[in-house]
Amino acid sequence: MHTFLLAFLAAALYGTGLVTTHFGLRYLPALAGARVSIPSAALLFWGLSPIFMDWAHWQGEAVMLFALVGSFYPAAVTLLTFVGNRRLGPTVAGTIGSTTPLFAVLGAALFLGEVPGIRESVATAVIVVGTMALSKPAGCPVPGTERSALWMPWSAALLRALAQVLSKAALALWTSPFAAAMIGYSISTVIVWTAGFLTERSVPSFNRRGVAWFALTGVLNGAAVLAMFYALTSGPVTIVAPVVATYPLFTLSLSALLIRHERMTARIVGGVILTVAGVIMLVAR
């Protein structure tokens, strides 16, 4: 149950972070926002490191794996998601992103020996279908001129799954979720700022409201990653990945309360029912 609670906490934080991102994008473009959110989490981790960081049992191979994960998660995944959203729309990108648990479960089976049982496999499939229903409104075809961009959300989904599998392997070597998050976000900070310098011809204009919203987003996402890493230390990827993927439930609920543009349709109700049913199947013993 400890693993489920941590995974649910990660899902809730991820879902909330998507809502705060919505507000932040009113004041800053996506890449500028990423250059605020990711470093904000990194700075928070470094600030707390004297309290929570224990270098006594550090393991070099684990540090290298943490850094490898940080080279693409969250930095590259964030950039792929932002560009994919811009070219394909959040609906298509979000729907493809919902397939992450399938790749994570497959990767865990191939590389970690975590072969899921029939119940876990069915529950994962039900959760994926449910989150797809929550992410994909009816009638949203991909423009023909933008179909070449479909590789972006697919790549983001694969990289998210790979991050979970590699992090699980690294945490088996050094059981320090805090180190995993701090090292990963530090590497991602360098990458996202480098990407900004290479792609932007002028210095980005930051304003206080945008910075505040994206700093909050960074803290929420960083806490979500930390909770997910703690869940991975106590449970298998085949359980953690599908539960973390339920974050659209929290995004939908908060959007209905704060943004108030989401209508309850049969599709959404069905998606909620499927997602909750899949989680119950995972929790049931």
Locate each region found by the language model.
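Juxtamembrane helix-start motifs in multi-pass secondary transporters
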Residues: A30-A34, A93, A180-A181, V240, ...
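Alpha-helical transmembrane segments of compact multi-pass small-molecule transporters, enriched
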Residues: S40-F45, I96-L110, A125-V126, I187-I191, ...
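Hydrophobic alpha-helical transmembrane segments in multi-pass integral membrane proteins
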Residues: F45-W55, A104-E120, L159-T175, L220-V237, ...
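Alpha-helical transmembrane segments of multi-pass integral membrane proteins
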Residues: W151-Q164, G184
